Design a protein with these regions (language model features):
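Conserved C-terminal portion of the radical SAM core fold
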Residues: 68-74, 94, 129-133
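N-terminal [4Fe-4S]-dependent radical SAM core
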Residues: 1-30, 35, 39, 43-49
């Protein structure tokens, strides 16, 4: 199957630009569905695997190509819960020259190596409300880690 035809369920796309979801002003793609249900989650509307809208990787790619920035963060929800779509979207965005960040509540060990090698930035770790921070860049709680490739 062509990567562009792969189905993906997203909550939405913030193309207005975020400076909180990785280096530089970035668009954010919010994947739909998350089993973690972290108390205090910033995006609880993304939890239901049936919410949001089903679309194609190609439609998401086209939407992002129409935006001026070539920086994008894939967040959610939990992107790792849609591995086929995540791999296809990352492949398409890399082909288009995007700087990609992936936000996951999982640990570094939970991220498949092919995905970890295909993105420039990773945010790992579940949000813990008692550890909430506003002083550590690009994370919501101090237990989370933000990784950048050299």
């Amino acid at each position: 199957m062509n990567e562009r035809d792969v189905k993906v369920r997203i909550h939405g796309i913030d193309e207005m630009g975020s400076a909180a979801d990785g280096p530089g002003v970035r668009s954010v793609v919010f994947f739909q569905g998350c089993h973690r249900h972290c108390p205090g989650c910033h995006n609880p509307e993304t939890w239901s695997p049936c919410g949001g809208a089903e679309t194609t990787v190609g439609a998401v790619e086209d939407h992002l190509l129409a935006v001026r920035t070539r920086r994008v963060t894939i967040s959610g929800g939990e992107p790792l819960e849609q591995l086929t779509a995540l791999r296809a979207l990352i492949a398409r965005l890399n082909a288009d020259g995007f700087d990609i960040a992936l936000y996951t509540g999982g640990s570094r060990d939970e991220i498949p190596e092919d995905i970890a090698r295909s993105v420039r930035h990773l945010k790992t770790g579940a949000f813990v409300q008692e550890l909430r921070t506003t002083t550590k860049p690009f994370v919501g709680s101090s237990n989370q880690t933000f990784w950048s490739a050299a």
